[in-house]
Amino acid sequence: MGVKGLNQLIKEHAPDAFKEYQLKNLFGRKVAIDASMCLYQYLIAVRQQDGQQLTSEDGETTSHLSGMFYRTIRLVESGLKPMYVFDGKPPVLKGGELEKRLLKRQDALKQIEDLKETGTVEELMKYEKRTVRASREQNDEAKKLLELMGIPYIVAPSEAEAQCAELARAGKVFAAASEDMDTLCYEPKYLLRHLTVAEARKMPIDQIDYEAMLKGLDMDRSTFVDLCILLGCDYCETIKGVGPVTAFKLIKEHGSLDNIVKWIQENPEKTKYKVPENWPYDEAKQLFMNPEITKGDEVDVKWNEPNVDGLVEFMVKQKGFSEERIRSGAEKLKKALKGGVQGRLDGFFTVVKSSPAKRKPDAKDAKGKGKKKAKR
């Protein structure tokens, strides 16, 4: 679900934290991608002309495999080095949110049955999107596909967003990539949004600089996490009637969520807000501040050459994809992975203070310097 209204608050109060990129601008960058979010997007977006999901001859959904295969190839062809992070076991505190989502899916399934006779395609699609979730089997299939493609992945101990942020913070990757704004609660160096859908929707990729965001909001990490909980997160409900503008104002006035709760409880005559009974906001904060993760320096990230025969066996013989297209995609991937070792230009140079002019290097010197390997 993410954090309600956070994106707009950052744009308003910390505009310098935002940068917009095209895919080509991220050439040479290593990125940790929230795999669960990707699978959800592909299950919704990758459809046949009649609006139905792609399926094999046996009727098994294959939209997630199509999206993961072709989108990953596109990322690698653009010079990125993607790795994926899958969700592990969800925190106990998230159970309430997951139960709400289940009820919404059940309600949507009922609406779909009612609309099958009289509803339009658009109406059916609206409710069908609410029923989408990646199953355990689909997650396992995506992992198998990535392994055959030579693309690294790991399974997080718990939340994938927290693990992506840790990898970015540890320098294993440049940024965490997810649509969930609560990734920022886990302190990534950078967050990339719309990375896996930007080209299809003709929209830019948003980069949020974590430190610039805190500076613009004039908050430390603890206060920022308090703000996110007050806005509404996956771990607990929020205070009814408190929207983004009010949440920001309350945090600025009182300094912390503890102080806000205390003020509301001690001054019921001065405010219309009521703190939810047994509100586990402090437990939610601890999950953000001290998430269950694998330390970045314990994670080995390596890209390998794709297993073409394995891809044909899995994607063509088992899942019914076109052999010509799978082989073509595998060759593109192989070529792009070999070409990706060039690195970024900013990995070759260090910015230094200006000094007295020196002679220009001749062509031979320039050629020699051009062969210097990037650090990363």
Curated annotation (Swiss-Prot):
User: What is the main EC category here?
Assistant: hydrolase
Which spans does this entry mark as compositional bias, Basic and acidic residues?
359-368
Q: Where in the cell is it found?
A: Nucleus, Nucleolus; Nucleus, Nucleoplasm; Mitochondrion
Task: Tell me the cofactors it needs.
Answer: Mg(2+)
Q: Where is this region: Disordered?
A: 356-376
| Biological process annotations from GO | base-excision repair; DNA replication, removal of RNA primer
GO molecular-function term, one example from the UniProt record: 5'-3' exonuclease activity
Q: What is its EC number?
A: 3.1.-.-
How does the cofactor bind to this protein, according to its record? Answer: Binds 2 magnesium ions per subunit. They probably participate in the reaction catalyzed by the enzyme. May bind an additional third magnesium ion after substrate binding.
Q: What cystine linkages occur within this chain?
A: none
**Where is the stretch described as Interaction with PCNA?**
341-349
Family matches, as Pfam families: XPG_I, XPG_N
Q: Which family does it belong to?
A: Belongs to the XPG/RAD2 endonuclease family. FEN1 subfamily.
The protein's job, in short, is:
Structure-specific nuclease with 5'-flap endonuclease and 5'-3' exonuclease activities involved in DNA replication and repair. During DNA replication, cleaves the 5'-overhanging flap structure that is generated by displacement synthesis when DNA polymerase encounters the 5'-end of a downstream Okazaki fragment. It enters the flap from the 5'-end and then tracks to cleave the flap base, leaving a nick for ligation. Also involved in the long patch base excision repair (LP-BER) pathway, by cleaving within the apurinic/apyrimidinic (AP) site-terminated flap.
Modifications made to the protein after synthesis? Phosphorylated. Phosphorylation upon DNA damage induces relocalization to the nuclear plasma.
**Which residues does Mg(2+) 2 bind?**
D180, D182, D234
Gene name, Swiss-Prot/TrEMBL: FEN1
Q: Name one GO cellular component term.
A: nucleoplasm
Q: What is the originating organism of this protein?
A: Clavispora lusitaniae (strain ATCC 42720) (Yeast)
Query: Which keywords, in A-to-Z order, does the entry hold?
Result: DNA damage, DNA repair, DNA replication, Endonuclease, Exonuclease, Hydrolase, Magnesium, Metal-binding, Mitochondrion, Nuclease, Nucleus, Phosphoprotein
Q: Region (N-domain): which ranges?
A: 1-105
| Residues noted as binding DNA in the record, renumbered to the chain | R47, R71, E159, G232, D234
Q: Which InterPro entries match?
A: 5-3_exonuclease_C_sf (IPR036279), Flap_endonuc (IPR023426), HhH2 (IPR008918), PIN-like_dom_sf (IPR029060), XPG-I_dom (IPR006086), XPG/Rad2 (IPR006084), XPG_CS (IPR019974), XPG_DNA_repair_N (IPR006085)
What quaternary structure, including any partners, is listed in this protein's UniProt entry?
Answer: Interacts with PCNA. Three molecules of FEN1 bind to one PCNA trimer with each molecule binding to one PCNA monomer. PCNA stimulates the nuclease activity without altering cleavage specificity.
Q: Where is this region: I-domain?
A: 123-254
Tell me the protein's name.
Flap endonuclease 1
